[in-house]
């Protein structure tokens, strides 16, 4: 089941992000989220703006992600998006590590909202790149988060 996150979920969300940061470091990607990203404040903002989602099953919270219908960092791309149509962007995707399939569940949810899906990731995040490629996204160039943090940009038109 996928549902909107609430502030009651904050502790569990931040625990998932803590596990994800450790996993990223252990798999050769120490820089994407460092020690403190996503920040508590950015998670609260996403909850308040009703764009943070929880993936849960009988086992409890399996993963978390945000779904944006616009991202200012995507306005300037060193490359070219597949089209300029309205889109959704998957951000802050993380799993608790207990069960596979979190990426696919988030992607299927995004597909239910739009046929235009964008996502970005760090050049060292090989696990995310593999998930992106397995799901037929096209690499379209590079974007810069907050104008400076380089990310690989991908686009899927369903």
Residues covered by each model-derived region:
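A short beta-loop-alpha structural element at the N-terminal edge
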Residues: 1-15
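Conserved GNAT-fold acetyl-CoA-binding loop/helix
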Residues: 22-41
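A short helix-loop-beta-strand connector motif used in the catalytic cores of GNAT acetyltransferases and
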Residues: 42-54
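Conserved beta-strand in the GNAT
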Residues: 54, 60-69
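Conserved acetyl-CoA-binding loop-helix of GNAT-fold acetyltransferases
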Residues: 95-112, 129-134
């Amino acid at each position: 089941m996928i549902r909107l996150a609430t502030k009651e979920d904050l502790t569990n969300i931040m625990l998932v992000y803590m596990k994800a940061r450790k996993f990223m470091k252990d798999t050769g990607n120490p820089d994407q989220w460092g020690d403190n990203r996503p920040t508590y404040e950015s998670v609260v903002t996403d909850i308040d703006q009703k764009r943070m989602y929880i993936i849960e099953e009988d086992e409890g919270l399996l993963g978390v992600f945000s779904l944006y219908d616009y991202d200012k960092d995507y306005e300037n791309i060193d490359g070219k998006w597949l089209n300029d149509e309205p889109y959704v962007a998957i951000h802050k995707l993380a799993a608790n590590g207990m069960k596979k399939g979190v990426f696919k569940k988030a992607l299927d949810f995004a597909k239910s909202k739009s046929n235009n899906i964008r996502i970005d990731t760090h050049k060292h995040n090989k696990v995310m790149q593999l998930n992106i490629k397995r799901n037929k996204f096209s690499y379209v160039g590079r974007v810069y988060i907050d104008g400076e943090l380089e990310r690989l940009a991908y686009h899927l038109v369903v």
